Amino acid sequence: PVGVAWALREAGFNAVQGFDAAFSSCVPLGSGLSSSAAMTCSTALALDDVYGLGYGASDAGRVTLINAAIKSENDMAGASTGGLDQNASMRCTFGHALRLDCRPELSPLENVSQQEFDLDKYGLELLVLDTQAPHQLNDGQYAQRRATCEKAAEILGVANLRVVADSIAKSDDPFQALKETLDKLEDDTMKKRVRHVITEIARVNSFVRAFANGKIDEAGRLFNASHDSLSADYEVTVPELDTAVAVARANG
């Protein structure tokens, strides 16, 4: 929390001073459910309210608070984060899924859209599980994955892997185009990371279309494929999570 106050002052909000705070949360710590973002974002909103900054009431204003929350985690806590959790915590709306586009050329007001996500209409519920598997942002795994992807983009001669993903999606034969892209990389681990990023972008776009058109079975298939890719190619799952997914699949 003190990191958020520091980040706001670094951004020029000198009205922010010292404060006493007590936190109570139902989000399990270290469970991969964005507990750190919940804390930093709630702190940012509290400081915005206490010191009358006037940024918490609008989406545009919340972007400023999000940036402070991200900076506090990256620069003070040493927990690398790209901003997904903070944007979800601050910008989601009830009954919708937040579609976040992280292309650097987009402004913060251009990079999100709200996608209707009414599960009740289909008799479904979103189940959130705490697998009890420990998770830490400062263990270096996030930074390692990001560095690998940035190195791959450098080898491929593009600014980021989104450029490659968009090019492949527009090709006449995306599968062949993906193979040709991966063939340009020598490191097997790098190939897996890139394959996940490119196919995950495609899955997100396909999921949005499927859900919008009421194709729930297709949306579910994409969810399953996403987990498989996270497990096999991006290697960020753990046995506890894989077991939970296997049990869920076995029970329909």
Where does each model-flagged region fall?
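C-terminal nucleotide
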Residues: 99-252
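Gly/Ser-rich oxyanion-binding loop with an adjacent helix/lid
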Residues: 1-118, 245-252
